[in-house]
From Swiss-Prot:
This is Zinc finger protein 595. Belongs to the krueppel C2H2-type zinc-finger protein family. It comes from Homo sapiens (Human). Keywords: DNA-binding, Metal-binding, Nucleus, Repeat, Transcription, Transcription regulation, Zinc, Zinc-finger. May be involved in transcriptional regulation. Residues 4-75 form the KRAB domain. SUPFAM superfamilies: beta-beta-alpha zinc fingers, KRAB domain (Kruppel-associated box). GO terms for molecular function: DNA-binding transcription factor activity, RNA polymerase II-specific; RNA polymerase II cis-regulatory region sequence-specific DNA binding; zinc ion binding. The keyword Cell cycle does not apply. Gene3D superfamilies: 6.10.140.140, Classic Zinc Finger. Signal peptide: none annotated. It is found in: Nucleus. One of its GO terms (cellular component) is nucleus.
Amino acid sequence: MELVTFRDVAIEFSPEEWKCLDPAQQNLYRDVMLENYRNLVSLGFVISNPDLVTCLEQIKEPCNLKIHETAAKPPAICSPFSQDLSPVQGIEDSFHKLILKRYEKCGHENLQLRKGCKRVNECKVQKGVNNGVYQCLSTTQSKIFQCNTCVKVFSKFSNSNKHKIRHTGEKPFKCTECGRSFYMSHLTQHTGIHAGEKPYKCEKCGKAFNRSTSLSKHKRIHTGEKPYTCEECGKAFRRSTVLNEHKKIHTGEKPYKCEECGKAFTRSTTLNEHKKIHTGEKPYKCKECGKAFRWSTSLNEHKNIHTGEKPYKCKECGKAFRQSRSLNEHKNIHTGEKPYTCEKCGKAFNQSSSLIIHRSIHSEQKLYKCEECGKAFTWSSSLNKHKRIHTGEKPYTCEECGKAFYRSSHLAKHKRIHTGEKPYTCEECGKAFNQSSTLILHKRIHSGQKPYKCEECGKAFTRSTTLNEHKKIHTGEKPYKCEECGKAFIWSASLNEHKNIHTGEKPYKCKECGKAFNQSSGLIIHRSIHSEQKLYKCEECGKAFTRSTALNEHKKIHSGEKPYKCKECGKAYNLSSTLTKHKRIHTGEKPFTCEECGKAFNWSSSLTKHKIIHTGEKSYKCEECGKAFNRPSTLTVHKRIHTGKEHS
């Protein structure tokens, strides 16, 4: 089979026709001739006379190939075409069919082509149509090399050849610096990474890149342009690669599989990040505190803790977050969306952290054990936080008041005290709270729900903490002891209020009259003086009370119930406070001391009466004769003089 020659792919122009061409068309003639020459040489074909190249480069008229070739053949303008530049018959047929097809579309029916020119007259182009022919030819010759695999076309054979390598997966060009393999164009760009060279700079923000394509993609951040749209859901993206990855969500395709655990991913980058879980690799280290992270994004978001920056802001309520995922989860509060579903029971949550906590209900496995106290946890993070109780470490400090906390979440909640922020609102009554847990407990007032029941007496409570405190009544446990006088209490709150007796502090102040008290209960009782509203009425006798607790205590009088029993003598009482006072008879405890004379009493009421001796105050007056007394009992005895009753 005959091989391709330089003349086999030629369209001819006569000297007369040549004169009709303008300079731009003549330049095109030269470029096409040179391109064809180079393509044939790159395939190993030999052109006999090297002077041909000089002729083509300096061309001012159609090149006379008689001078440059052994066979006397007329001048020609060449337009390259080849699948692989195979033997002459295939190339001639394909080339001429393509040229004719392209030219016919342009309306040049009179153009005639031949397979291998022998005379000038064999290839004729009508005068006056040369300009159109050249326009067609310039389009044709610019996309002439076609890939067999993907039908992509190229203007240069060398580009076509490079492109074909992509289908084989072969990357023949190796980086001498790191040994990685690339395609030629990619290698050039890659070497810039080692050199630190970033010649492409963004005019908007000044950020520099080592690739022009990277700069082009970056610019879309400023313009907001998202040219790549998903046909499935209409979502738009800045980059085609991101769109391709996104499409896998719809197809369910997960081509990247972890060899360690078999988990599959839609992206290779996600797989690479996942592998760090198995290797334990944490390459991204915080310069501020030394903490290491698996992912660069985690490090960047962690840095916000040190800077205090909260770049992610909710458009709905204005709340700002350090992490983008925290903002995304927060948005679910506004939308009501609960995307995190428990696989075991189907319960849904609006935050992933809530789901993680919930899962521990189903799984009793607690792998992480505290060496200090033996307490076990389902998560290592929980163990690390727990350890701070033993070490006393409180890394999260409030900038407002200096108070420190074990956990960042506790600090976040604490800050609301200073800001006054109450983001959790009750839909029932409109009352707002600064903690979600407080809102949940509040809702039980409306629902009447009391899920925490005492096994001892059957009493139910809205809070687990209240139940735990209540249990101490049955056990007699008093873990909170006063260092000043040794008195012990069931509740820490009671101890704190008791301390006010020793310090003389009276933090509970009445807004109506300004009177202050050292105990909150004293203020609550006092308030009833100003308010005559008694909402809680006894159905038995009609007596009304300002507090529900007072009504409940009162009801025991009618029922005869005496649940508070003295272990010492067996005597029972309807009030826990009465039992407490009674116990002092057995213990001999006299916690109430007169500051004037040092005398001690077992009841506060006895101390109050005693103080009248020192003050001389006589607040109990006889309505009959006006005589005054310092004790009500003395007044009662005195009244018998007027009634005529004898003193018994």
